[in-house]
């Protein structure tokens, strides 16, 4: 099949899953065409079965803002005709499903172009922030030829808000060949020269990820007398706040802010416990990646995370913002290597 895939090319779960899905489809003999404003984060290699089509933005004095939705629809339509696409798979209803539906309708009747939309959760939060987006978001979902959600939580939330339930749950995934615990002795030595256990946080450092809470948790762990270090992987608007809080608490020298990294699996393999204290997660891909690397997870009991992390078996769940309990759970895992290894193996 010739498959068009559109994702946000940013450092986030949807772009990662979309990229990995495309690569796995290509490995099975399909030809995948990524249609986006930039090369997706995890799409590091292009070949005859994995191709990239950049959406070109038009600068026109009449438009105050560049019309990305229309530009994307135009590129989708063009690629569909030139490459004889069999379907479009878009991640997020807004704006991607709207663009895909426009492209599909523009090609009728000479070409049939089914549209599959995968919901990742931002569509729900967008409507929650501004109800005026509800009709157009619902239109993008209802008019899709197929709709999937990444968790049962998200399916139920979509049903409640949009009164639409023809949704198939297909959880996010990681490739076991790529995500497994590796021997990264040199990296671990760099991150922890004195051999202390390592807490790690991986995200895009948006407020919803609560990276400052990771610093608060770590400070409480140190106060309990546990010798450890904190590794913060990623970048975003909250990074400066997290660094500032670490300095205020006098623990900055025990933290490593390493920014965006191309090989997350190396950092997960080097560390011992993942912190994911998010306000909201429709799934929690970082948790799944950590678990694949035998790293137990300390996370919020929110959204789809309980479908990923089994409390007391593969990690510990707590109410959002309960940094005291998260610190207790983290300290317990850091000092009990046997428990940590058992949980990691179950994960």
Regions found by a protein language model. Give the residues of each.
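Carbohydrate-associated surface elements
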Residues: 153, 173
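N-terminal strand-loop element at the rim of the active site
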Residues: 7-11, 23-70
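Short hydrophobic beta-strand element within catalytic cores of glycosyltransferases
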Residues: 296-299, 309
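A short helix/loop element that forms part of the nucleotide-sugar donor recognition site in Leloir-type
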Residues: 179-193
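Nucleotide-activated donor-binding/catalytic signature segment of Leloir-type glycosyltransferases, i.e.
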Residues: 243-259
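Conserved donor-binding/catalytic core segment of Leloir-type glycosyltransferases
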Residues: 193-218
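A short, well-ordered alpha-helix in the C-terminal region of glycosyltransferases
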Residues: 325, 332, 339-347
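Aromatic "clamp/platform" in nucleotide-sugar-dependent glycosyltransferases that forms part
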Residues: 260, 279
């Amino acid at each position: 099949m010739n498959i068009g895939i559109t994702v946000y090319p940013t450092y986030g779960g949807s772009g990662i899953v979309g990229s990995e899905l495309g690569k796995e489809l290509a490995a099975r003999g399909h030809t995948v065409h990524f249609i986006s404003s930039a090369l997706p984060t995890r799409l590091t290699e292009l070949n005859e079965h994995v191709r990239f089509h950049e959406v070109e933005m038009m600068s026109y004095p009449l438009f105050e803002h560049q019309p990305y939705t229309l530009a994307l629809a135009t590129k989708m339509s063009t690629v569909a005709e030139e490459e004889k696409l069999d379907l479009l798979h878009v991640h997020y209803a807004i704006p991607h499903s709207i663009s895909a539906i426009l492209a599909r309708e523009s090609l009728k009747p000479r070409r049939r172009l089914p549209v599959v939309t995968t919901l990742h959760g931002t569509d729900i939060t967008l409507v929650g922030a501004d109800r005026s987006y509800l009709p157009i978001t619902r239109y993008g979902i209802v008019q899709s030829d197929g709709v999937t959600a990444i968790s049962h939580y998200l399916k139920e939330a979509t049903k409640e808000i949009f009164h639409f339930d023809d949704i198939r749950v297909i959880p996010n995934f990681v490739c076991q060949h790529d995500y497994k615990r590796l021997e990264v002795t040199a990296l671990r030595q760099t991150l922890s020269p004195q051999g202390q256990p390592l807490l790690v946080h991986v995200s895009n450092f948006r407020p919803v990820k609560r990276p400052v809470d990771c610093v608060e948790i770590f400070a409480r762990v140190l106060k309990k007398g546990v010798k450890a270090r904190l590794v913060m992987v990623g970048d975003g608007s909250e990074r400066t706040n997290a660094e500032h809080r670490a300095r205020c608490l006098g623990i900055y020298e025990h933290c490593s802010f390493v920014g965006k990294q191309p090989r997350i699996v190396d950092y997960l393999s080097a560390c011992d416990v993942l912190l994911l204290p998010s306000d909201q997660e429709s799934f929690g891909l970082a948790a799944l990646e950590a678990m694949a690397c035998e790293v137990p997870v300390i996370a919020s009991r929110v959204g789809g995370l309980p479908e990923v992390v089994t409390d007391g078996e593969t990690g510990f769940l707590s109410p959002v913002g309960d940094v005291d309990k998260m610190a207790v759970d983290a300290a317990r895992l850091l000092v009990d290597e046997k428990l940590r290894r058992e949980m990691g193996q179950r994960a």
